[in-house]
């Protein structure tokens, strides 16, 4: 995942137009986390998911750098930067067989 993370991070930060202070990867309960100090953490288990899921989580967390909550403005940002985010979210949360 580290190999692909650099690619996805460059792509997504360019697309969204903001950059985190730091990105870490570790085991965690959520797929991603964004702190107010602009540090993003991604779940190591994303490596087992399709690459589009990593891109979605990165865009989701980068949007939190603009809008910290999940209100209408956040959803509008997601709709703009990742129009199919709802479908990707379903794919991400499917149980592995």
Locations of regions flagged by a protein language model:
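Walker B catalytic acidic pair
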Residues: 61
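Active-site-proximal or metal-binding-adjacent scaffold patches in catalytic folds
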Residues: 1-56, 65-97
């Amino acid at each position: 995942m580290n190999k692909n993370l650099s690619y996805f991070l460059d792509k997504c930060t360019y697309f969204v137009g903001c950059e985190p202070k730091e990105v870490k990867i570790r085991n965690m309960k959520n797929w991603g986390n964004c702190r107010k100090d602009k540090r993003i953490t991604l779940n190591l288990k994303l490596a087992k998911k399709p690459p589009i899921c990593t891109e979605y989580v990165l865009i989701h967390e980068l949007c939190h750098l603009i809008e910290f909550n999940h209100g209408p403005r956040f959803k509008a940002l997601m709709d703009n930067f990742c129009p199919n985010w709802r479908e990707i979210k379903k794919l991400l949360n499917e149980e592995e067989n």
